[in-house]
A protein has these predicted regions:
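Acidic, two-metal ion nucleic-acid-processing modules in DNA metabolism proteins
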Residues: 1-278
Length: 278
């Protein structure tokens, strides 16, 4: 991954103090040195990480819901105590159909139920609200979970805590490849994937936004919904052109503006400049 301590150490001569390790660091600097620090640390990243390392989640075992039993959880207890040098196992549950989602803990967390071939699994996702959950009942999802045992009224239950989730069938290699190419292009470097959103692609994106009456989830969530029709960069530039043309507004969420006339997207500065660079 990106070594934040190494990056900050590279700027040590303009810092009043600093410390940390590869995953976290703290520092102090004078106000007059903020601009210099910003340039130095960004130059370090560009020179040492032309493509930023991909954040990965290790799945220790792919698991069918039918093998999600108390016996399994009890056997996992033999591996304790878990910690930095002995990570708690993460299990992958793939191609489950979402059957129920409910807010718990004053709306700060989610209780999620999903099923596969008649076997239902109950899970909890902490620090995620209903407004942040982009999926609907009937969607097919993959889950990465940690398992433990909880006891209520003298009865033991399986506790499945969701570490991460995603839509099933996602081509994650395509996502990272296209995202990296887009970011490198923004830095002035050549790209290997299509970036220009032609009329048909713009139509796909705009029709989807209209069908959803805007979009309240993340850019990546929107990309995964449309990934079969476009590239990461094409979506990014299409949204930029929409906003410039007054079709949408982006303030966290995407909202559709009430537009009475057709917009000529090809005449936007966004697409004119893009076409000139390609």
């Amino acid at each position: 991954g990106f070594n934040i301590f190494e990056a900050i150490s590279n700027c040590s001569d303009i810092l009043t103090h600093f410390g940390g390790h590869p995953l976290a660091a703290g520092m102090g600097l004078n106000v007059k040195d903020i601009a210099a620090f910003r340039k130095r640390i960004n130059d370090f990243a560009k020179n040492n990480y032309p493509v930023m390392p991909i954040q990965t989640l290790k799945i220790d075992c792919k698991l069918s819901p039918y093998y999600l039993t108390l016996d399994l959880v009890n056997n996992l207890a033999e591996l304790e105590p878990f910690g930095t040098d002995n990570a708690q196992p993460v299990f992958g549950l793939y191609n489950l159909t979402l059957t129920n989602v409910a807010a718990i803990g004053d709306g700060k967390h989610l209780k999620i139920e999903a099923a596969k071939k008649g076997k239902s699994v109950r899970m909890v996702k902490f620090r995620t609200t209903l407004d942040e959950f982009p999926h609907k009942i009937g969607d097919t999802l993959d889950f990465a979970v940690k398992l433990s045992k909880s006891t209520f009224k003298n009865k033991d239950y399986i506790s499945a805590q969701i570490v991460d989730f995603r839509k099933s069938g996602i081509d994650i290699d395509k996502y990272y490849r296209e995202k990296n190419d887009y970011l490198l292009f923004k830095l002035g470097k050549k790209n290997k994937t299509e970036l220009y959103p032609n009329r048909d692609i713009c139509a796909v994106v705009y029709k989807y936004l209209k069908s959803q009456k805007g979009y309240k989830y993340t850019f990546d969530d929107l990309y995964f919904e449309l990934a079969n029709y476009l590239t990461y960069g094409q979506l990014a530039f299409a949204l930029d052109a929409f906003e410039e043309a007054g079709l949408i507004k982006r303030e966290g969420n995407i909202t559709l503006n009430d537009v009475k006339t057709k917009a000529n997207l090809e005449r936007t500065d966004t697409l004119t400049v893009l076409k000139g660079r390609l």
